[in-house]
Amino acid sequence: MALWRAYQRALAAHPWKVQVLTAGSLMGLGDIISQQLVERRGLQEHQRGRTLTMVSLGCGFVGPVVGGWYKVLDRFIPGTTKVDALKKMLLDQGGFAPCFLGCFLPLVGALNGLSAQDNWAKLQRDYPDALITNYYLWPAVQLANFYLVPLHYRLAVVQCVAVIWNSYLSWKAHRL
C-alpha cells in the first residue's frame, strides 16, 4: 500500500516521466516473462540485450505514443459516460491498435538488425495474428479503462494488463 501511495505521489508530481518509466519497466517485465516462462530460456540463456531493447521501446516508443494517444483521445471525445467509453474503445481498437502494431513489430525487427526485406516478410507473417490476438484482449480492457479509470492512470492500468500482452508481443516480435 505504501508503494502505491508513493507511485501516486510521483505520478502527481511528474506524470509524463512516471508514465513513460512505468511503460518501460513493464515492457521489460513482459520480455523477462516471455524469455523465462514462455521460451524457457533459463537465466544462463536469458538475452539481457533483448530485455533492454524492450525497456527502451517502452520508454521511448510505447509510453510516449500510447500516453499521447490517450490525451488526444480524451480531447477528441471528452466525457466518461458508457457511450463515450464505447466511442473511445472503437477508435482505439479500430484506428490506433492496427497502426500501433504496424509500427511496433517492424521497429523491433529493425532494432534486431533485420534487413528491410526480412522485416517486411516478418511483418506480413506476424501482423495478422498479432492484430487478431489483440482483439481477444484489448476491447474489453479498453472499454473498462475508458469508462472507469481517470486519464492520468490509464497508461499504468493498461501497462499492468499489458505485462501478459507484452510477453506475447516480445515472443512474437523476436520469433524468427
UniProtKB/Swiss-Prot annotation:
Q: Which domain of life is it from?
A: Eukaryota
In which tissues or organs does this protein occur? Ubiquitous. Expressed in pancreas, kidney, muscle, liver, lung, placenta, brain and heart.
Q: What is the effect of changing V66E?
A: In MTDPS6; uncertain significance
Instruction: From the record heading the sequence, give the disease linked to this protein.
Output: Mitochondrial DNA depletion syndrome 6: A disease due to mitochondrial dysfunction. It is characterized by infantile onset of progressive liver failure, often leading to death in the first year of life, peripheral neuropathy, corneal scarring, acral ulceration and osteomyelitis leading to autoamputation, cerebral leukoencephalopathy, failure to thrive, and recurrent metabolic acidosis with intercurrent infections.
Which named protein is this? Answer: Mitochondrial inner membrane protein Mpv17
Consequence recorded when altering G95D: In MTDPS6; uncertain significance
Q: Which PANTHER family match?
A: PEROXISOMAL MEMBRANE PROTEIN 2, PXMP2 MPV17, PROTEIN MPV17
Q: Name one GO biological process term.
A: glomerular basement membrane development
Site (Determines ion selectivity) found at D92
Which species is the source of this protein?
Homo sapiens (Human)
Q: How does it sit in the membrane?
A: Multi-pass membrane protein
One GO location term (cellular component): mitochondrion
The family this protein is said to belong to:
Belongs to the peroxisomal membrane protein PXMP2/4 family.
Tell me the function of this protein.
Answer: Non-selective channel that modulates the membrane potential under normal conditions and oxidative stress, and is involved in mitochondrial homeostasis. Involved in mitochondrial deoxynucleoside triphosphates (dNTP) pool homeostasis and mitochondrial DNA (mtDNA) maintenance. May be involved in the regulation of reactive oxygen species metabolism and the control of oxidative phosphorylation.
The UniProt keywords, alphabetically, are: Charcot-Marie-Tooth disease, Disease variant, Membrane, Mitochondrion, Mitochondrion inner membrane, Neurodegeneration, Neuropathy, Primary mitochondrial disease, Transmembrane, Transmembrane helix
Effect annotated for changing T80A: Does not affect gating properties of the channel
Claim: Metal-binding is one of the keywords in the record:
no
Q: Where in the cell is it found?
A: Mitochondrion inner membrane
**Positions of transmembrane segments:** 18-38, 53-73, 94-114, 131-151
List GO molecular-function terms, semicolon-separated.
channel activity
Task: Tell me the organism's taxonomic lineage.
Answer: Eukaryota, Metazoa, Chordata, Craniata, Vertebrata
